[in-house]
Amino acid sequence: MIKILFICHGNICRSTMAESVMTYLVEKEGLADKFYINSAATSREEIGNGVHHGTVAKLKKEGIPVIPHRAVQMTLNDYEEYDYLIGMDTENIRNMQRISGGDPDEKIYKLLTFAGSGLDVADPWYTGDFEATYRDVLAGCKGLLEIGRAHV
């Protein structure tokens, strides 16, 4: 089983969107039993809060079920438990490395790396552009699915 943890700053917009999109993609491909998918934050600011209404609206518009979720913070234990820890931007990656004590097992990636880009997924909390975030998340998740498919 491939274990994936999507991570963003607050765990209410981008990482929850990626969790829902990736879950949808693996279910659509009949691979749900081969993947364990979750999400977390690097900060404590939104702990306990649900998925942002903008993320919910965009996912519903795309026909993607929203995974019920309450924001949690990434821990060192998560680094040990997951195969892939996927951050949304450079700041997330830096904070993930701080939480995990570096990346000795090379498990930390930026999502758009899987779409052939080193760019950040813009945070719709600030941009208000959930459409652009969705396009990036979908591209990254599709690329990650191809990598995962080769290992299941």
Report each predicted region and the residues it spans:
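Conserved active-site segments centered on acidic
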Residues: 1-81, 149
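Hydrophobic structural packing positions in well-ordered secondary structure
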Residues: 8, 59, 86-87, 137
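Phosphate-binding/catalytic loops
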Residues: 84, 90-149
